Amino acid sequence: MVSDAEIKRINELVKKSREEGLTEEEKLEQKALRQKYIDAVKLSLRANLDSIRYVEDLEENKPKQ
């Protein structure tokens, strides 16, 4: 998971890149932090999607009376 400090750093780098530009080292740091954030979002989304159950599937699995 991405920490609040890492999200804050991502935002700092975005602001700095807009105002004055980034050094090569900062660009690499920004790229790594962004990728970590994207991976965390994908993982969270996958977990949410995997937990979805369709109503039709639940109805089919009920015992028939």
Swiss-Prot record:
Domain of life: Bacteria
Key words of the record: Cytoplasm
Alphabetical list of InterPro entries matching this protein: DUF896
GO cellular component, one term: cytoplasm
Principal subcellular localisation of the protein: cytoplasm
Transmembrane residue ranges: none
Localization (cell): Cytoplasm
Pfam families: DUF896
UniProt record similarity statement: Belongs to the UPF0291 family.
Name of protein: UPF0291 protein BBR47_33060
Species: Brevibacillus brevis (strain 47 / JCM 6285 / NBRC 100599)
Phylogenetic classification of the source organism: Bacteria, Bacillati, Bacillota, Bacilli, Bacillales
